[in-house]
Regions:
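Amphipathic alpha-helical transducer elements in NTP-driven molecular machines
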Residues: 96-100, 120, 152-153, 172
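Residue-level signal for inorganic ion chemistry
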Residues: 51, 79, 118, 170, ...
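Catalytic core of IPPT-family isopentenyl/dimethylallyl transferases
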Residues: 6, 16-44, 141-261
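N-terminal phosphate/diphosphate-binding loop that engages ATP/GTP or pyrophosphate donors
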Residues: 33-114, 124-135
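Phosphate/Mg2+-binding loops and adjacent switch elements
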Residues: 105-160, 164-168
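Acidic, Ala/Val/Gly-enriched low-complexity intrinsically disordered segments
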Residues: 2, 14-15
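Alpha-helix/helix-capping structural signal
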Residues: 53-54, 120-121, 196
Length: 261
C-alpha cells in the first residue's frame, strides 16, 4: 500500500512538471537572431519566431526575416504562415494558439522550445499565459527569458547601416512585388515602419533622403518604446543582457542552470 501511494505521488509530481521554454527577446537590431542560432545548436533547440510581421509570406527583407542559410539547419516555426494577399492581420491570440501547439510538439520530440523575436506582446502572452475575454491568465510553462538591451550608442549606427543594407538588398523591389501580387497598400501601411515608408516612397510621397531620415528616426522611436515595454517584464524569469561581447557566454550559463534545475 505504501508503495502504491509513493507511486501515485511520483506520477502526480511528473504530471505537474511544466515544460521549460527559453525566450530570446530584446530591442530591434540587438542581435537576437545570431545569438539564438548559436544557443539552439548548443542546446538542441527548435526556434519559434515571435515577430508580428515575419508570419507573412514574402515580407522578408523589410521584416529582417532569417534566411535559410542563416538558420544553419535549425528548425524554425511561425514563419511564412499567412498569405498577405488575404488582408488578414495575425493577432496575439493567433500567435499564442500556434505557439502553444508548436511548443508542445517540440517538447514531445525531446528538444528545447525557444521563442525568438521582438514582438513583446507575443512572447509575454505565452510566458504569462494570457487569458482572453473573461479567461484568467494561466501560465503553462516554466520560463527563462533572456532580453537583449544594448545601449543606444551601440544600436544607433547598426540601425542606420541596416537600413541602407536592406534597401541595397532589394527592400523596395520586395514591396513593389507585394503590391503587384495584390497585397493592399493599406495592409502594408498598417504594418508600420519599413513597409509604410516603402509604400510612401514608391508612391512618390517622399524622396530617398527623406525616406532614410524618417526610417531612422521612426525606428529609434520604436526601439525606445520597446525598451519601456521590456523593462516591465516579469523579474522572476527575465535576465537583461547589455554587452554584446558577453551575450553568448552569459546566455549559455543561464540556460544551462535553467535546464538542470
Amino acid at each position: 500500500m505504501a508503495k502504491i501511494c509513493l507511486l501515485r505521488l511520483f506520477w502526480l509530481g511528473v504530471a505537474k512538471m511544466k515544460t521549460k521554454i527559453v525566450i530570446i527577446s530584446g530591442i530591434t537590431a540587438s542581435g537576437k537572431t545570431a545569438l539564438s542560432i548559436e544557443l539552439a545548436k548548443q542546446f538542441n533547440a527548435e526556434i519559434i519566431s515571435a515577430d508580428s510581421r515575419q508570419v507573412y509570406q514574402g515580407l522578408d527583407i523589410g521584416s529582417a526575416k532569417i534566411t535559410p542559410a542563416e538558420m544553419q539547419g535549425i528548425p524554425h516555426h511561425c514563419l511564412d504562415i499567412i498569405d498577405p494577399t488575404q488582408n488578414t492581420l495575425y493577432s496575439v491570440g493567433d500567435f499564442q494558439r500556434d505557439a502553444y501547439t508548436t511548443i508542445d510538439q517540440i517538447s514531445a520530440r525531446g528538444k528545447v522550445p525557444m521563442l525568438v523575436g521582438g514582438t513583446g506582446l507575443y512572447t509575454r502572452s505565452v510566458a504569462e499565459g494570457y487569458g482572453f475575454g473573461d479567461e484568467p491568465n494561466n501560465p503553462r510553462y516554466e520560463v527563462l527569458q533572456i532580453c537583449l538591451m544594448p545601449p543606444k550608442n551601440l544600436i544607433a549606427p547598426k540601425v542606420e547601416q541596416r537600413n541602407k543594407e536592406r534597401v541595397a538588398n532589394g527592400m523596395f523591389e520586395e514591396t513593389r512585388d507585394l503590391l503587384a501580387r495584390g497585397v493592399p497598400s493599406g495592409f502594408l501601411y498598417k504594418l508600420g515602419l519599413e513597409y509604410r515608408l516603402n509604400v510612401r516612397y514608391l508612391q512618390g510621397e517622399i524622396d530617398l533622403p527623406t525616406y532614410y531620415n524618417e526610417l531612422y528616426h521612426q525606428t529609434m522611436q520604436f526601439i525606445k518604446r520597446q525598451r519601456t515595454w521590456y523593462r516591465k517584464e516579469n523579474p522572476a524569469y527575465t535576465h537583461y543582457l547589455t554587452d554584446p561581447s558577453t551575450y553568448l557566454a552569459t546566455a549559455t550559463q543561464l540556460i544551462q542552470q535553467f535546464l538542470v534545475k
